[in-house]
Amino acid sequence: MAPKNHQKYTIKNDIQHVLDCSDVYIGDTAPTARSEWMFDDAVNQIVWRPTTTPEALVRIFVEVLTNAVDNIERSINGGHELCKNIKVDVDLKTGKTSVWNDGQVIPVVKNCDNGVVQPPPPTTEQDRLAYEKLNREYIHTIIFGHFRTSSNYDNETDQVSGKNGVGVKCTNIFSSWFSVVGVDPDRKLKFSQEWRSNMTKSGAPQVVKCALKTGYTLVEYVPDFARFKLKSYPEDVESIFKKLVVDASAFFPNTAFFFNGERTVVKNAVAYAKLYYNLNETAVDSVVIDYKDSKVVVVGSATPLPPVSFVNGQITPAGGQHVTNWSRVIFGALLAALNGKKNVSLTKADIAPYFQLFIHSKVSKPKFDGQNKNCLKSPKVEAHLDATILKKMLKWKIISTIQDKVVKSKEYLALKKIECRRTPIVKVDGYDQANRLGPDSVLIVCEGLSAKSYAVAGIQKGLFNKKGRTYFGILPLRGKFLNVKNTTPLKIGQNKVVSDFIKVLNLKFNLDYRKATNYATLNYGTLLILTDADKDGIHIKGLILNLIHELFPTLFHRQGFIYSMETPIVKILHKKGQPTLFYDENSFEDWRAQHPELKHFKYYKGLGTIGPADVAAFFGSKVVRYHYDEATDAAVNSVFKDENANERKEWLGRFNPRVSQWCLDHHREAVIDLKISDFMHHEMIKFSYEDCRRSLASCIDGFKESQRKIIYAVRKKFRSNSTEFIKVAQLSGYVAEQTDYKHGEQNLCETIVKFAQDFVGANNVQLLEPDGQFGTRLEGGKDSAAPRYIYTKPHKILPYIFREEDDPILEQSSEGEPVHFVPIIPLVLVNGSVGIGTGWSCFVPQYNPLELIRYIEARLTSQDSEALLPAKPWYRNFTGKVAATGPGKFTTFGRMKQVDADTVRVTELPVGMWTDRFKDQCYSLIESGQLQQLVNESTVSKVDFTLKKLQDISALKLTTTLHTTNMVLFDRENVITKYDTIGDILDHYFQTRLAFYKVRKNHTIAQLKNTIQHNETKLKFIEKVLTDHSFLRQDDAAIVSILEKENFLKVDNSYNYLLNISIRSCTATAVEKLQSTIKGLTESLIRVQQTPTRQMWYDELQQLKQVGNWSEP
């Protein structure tokens, strides 16, 4: 059907078509709000900022700049003068914009004289006339003033930015004035021509002679601002244009680029990439990939940016084939590596925001999506990532960020599986659910089943104006509570203790509990933590607070949600009145020092030791309410995050265990408010310190806490009889009974066994004697028999190292155990020490006891002791070699000899390599074809391997390394100290032991004097009885009166020790014996008084050497 209205059809010329359809050629001419990359001179970086500068105004500049940049490649490929300079100038006031370049020049000739064979003339008269006119035009005129003309039409033309024959003509069309100047040094001519009014008016070409030896092309124009709805250039144009010049200078380093007279220097592609990042930001990781015709810079940064890409020097904002292929290769390799290590599947979308790609590809005959050339359509760009570059990238800091943020966020999604719907009954082992669930109910989380019994008894008394099972639920923790900051969500979900805790409270991940509606979904509105009053109890509180901080942080903002119930550690019993309770060990020790008469007190080792009678008095008497403050986040992270280890070292180094920064005993109120940050700094540090006490040895006695408890109990048990063996299992039970040890008797058994081991690499000096299989060098002691089958007793050397004379003056803890022993040789160097504590670890190698004794003897006799410092570690019965191989570094070598051309025999292994491990290593070499045969003739104590046709001796790994760079020990004040050399350790030990002898000497003199006086008084009393027969016929009061008048010595303010003397003690024989005793004591007193302390130590060392019977090093 014909249209009702006639439609008008018009034919537009090329110029009018471009002007009317600008979006087809150069984009929108109207000012529109968008964001654009710009160069900010103030901070010397590329920034992403909003702008209203028309897209088309930028495009017409790009067309001119691209022509100049294309000249770089043309000059190289054409064998012409290289393009050395490109100069851009922009006048914001007048709008005049110019681009100047040298290199390959446009010849100043007419098209017909260009030397190029022209196509046959058109057949129509009109086309023939146009053809002849074009042939009479200069080449400059054709390129810049005629549509669909371009040298790039030539299919042989390679790496340039396009070949539509439009390009720079668009600049001319959208300019009120346009000019081109060209110098041809070969023809010694200079060409110039101007156009006006959107290329509709052109001036005649001007050609003059020119003697310049360097040719150039200069394009200048003034935009037709009216067509862009502007009066002049916007202010940010300069920043936008300069950024485009900087782009080009980055990828063509052999050409100097200038913008408004100033050179834009970008050293390389990496320097260009870093222009996109804040200079104040921590230095980012980067790598450059050069592959075929592409140069790619990959930057690892948490600042998400889209890929920045170029083709032949021209920016491609929408990317294209080159971006797609490089992204696929780079992110594909990263994903394969990351997903291979994790239990979650990452995608490109997960990791791409953490990597910035800068891609520049030189592409032959590129095809774009349009004249704007925003996106490369073809050809396909090849991409490849070398394995060494991938390995480097996997070590970047940003990988840890991805693992922390992206991987964990995905893993936390998996954690949601442990959430449970709110059901009437939550089934968890040992859990007693409150009869009413909701915000008014209280969940008591306690430490094990024994603590549960305390809680069940206590809720009958009640707390928070509630009592009984109506509002109280009880969850006993049955297992290890994880530090959730240093583990994967997968492991968190697999931990039954944590998952039970989450289920019972009905906690939901990513829920904001600051909102009342979300808070009301919890099964309990209050969490009450009930643990033992020891350091492990503090640790459990900290772990629960850490879990909430990491997984449910908004609960910290619910004031009054988290409480802990405290119980006393000591109860003082008085004859009259109420008992005194202490919740802090230091405050108890202070009080005890002021009350030396204290005899009766009860020490509570845990909730299980609190009897039913005490529950009513203790339950709820001290409750701590935890508060979030601005320092909480940093405090929790500093205590629990692995990366804060160095911070914890400083933290522990400042800690004084004898001073409580926060003390419950200073608070009389029932509910005490405590900031979580204060709990971390003042309470958690007690556990961290205690953890180090368990893991790190003392510089003075060489013992960790459990080792010290064992020796204390052994000396106590075998004081009267050291000849009978005892089962290791029985001894561990005795140690646990006699000391304040709470960590399982199995650990004690292992430590007892190690004290008695005598194979190479174990003890240089055994402290316990073995009877049974205590382990061999076959498995490094792991092959010992079960503790119930093996026996031990003190080694004969034990009393010579730990002198009985020392016992009365050893500093004791509140449990009556030594804070540390003071052996007569530095055991920490004799037997070495290895341990890992909170923030600290330690390794001290072993040294020959004879060498250490010689050093001490030299210091005692004021000889040159420095020369006698042990030069290297020493291990008893080790027949290999120990050599210094660097500062603080020693290497131990096994022994091997060549039997014949095909056979070697190994007769010693390096320290720390066990026989069976070496055997397994050799079998692996046989399986891999590096060894033909192994003959094993080793015994439990000797190494003997014969190897046939070994290809590479180094594969045996017959060396181990010992270091003296991490000798971290407790000093005499129990402060964690890192010792740089064994000389430092020896000096600290020597000063301590020598001072100890002075104290011991004074104590011994006082004790001898007291004993002599006591015996002399007894002798005087006996002699009085024997000479005054009427003396005992009087009553007690008269006798006491006489004794007082005659100044008889009282003991404990009485004369009972005299009045209770038996008749047998009053015989002449007894008197003679007592006189002999007094004489012996007096001689001992004189001997002690006359013996210098240094001589005392020296003499005891001689006794030790005789018993030790050690071999020379």
Curated annotation (Swiss-Prot):
Domain Toprim: 441-563
Keywords: ATP-binding, DNA-binding, Isomerase, Magnesium, Metal-binding, Nucleotide-binding, Topoisomerase
Needed co-factor(s): Mg(2+); Mn(2+); Ca(2+)
Reaction(s) this enzyme catalyzes, per UniProt: ATP-dependent breakage, passage and rejoining of double-stranded DNA
Residues binding Mg(2+) 2, per UniProt: 532, 534
Site for Transition state stabilizer, residues: 788
Keyword DNA-binding annotated: yes
Family according to the record: Belongs to the type II topoisomerase family.
Name of the protein: DNA topoisomerase 2
Species of the source: Invertebrate iridescent virus 3
